[in-house]
């Protein structure tokens, strides 16, 4: 999969089944890799996904411009395009970050928040693409993950984030 052939766009109602598949894959991946407690009980729920889509805060990473085995082109304007990743992004105060238990924020400026990042396991660099997209919208970003999610903690730090 060529990341150059991916676009990021707002999620739409028609994407919901694929989004739920990606989150299901992410839950099983996390459980198999020492993180069985994050997103348990089928979180994020369909209701949360609906709210995120309605609010315009859910984004998908979609592969475009490829061909299937039968030679049919896939792309963002084609129903056969493939969504490989999903993430929540919103600019403005996030209730999750009203209180920081240990440490201090690096900046009190207006910020964007990234939550619920997940990929389908077929591509690498989903978080990197999400961060690059969000950085084009606002300078200051915040992100967090579950204490048991060591893989995501590593990837977050690899993308330039500092623990506060």
What kind of region is each of these model predictions?
Residues 136-148:
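Conserved GNAT acetyl-CoA-binding A-motif
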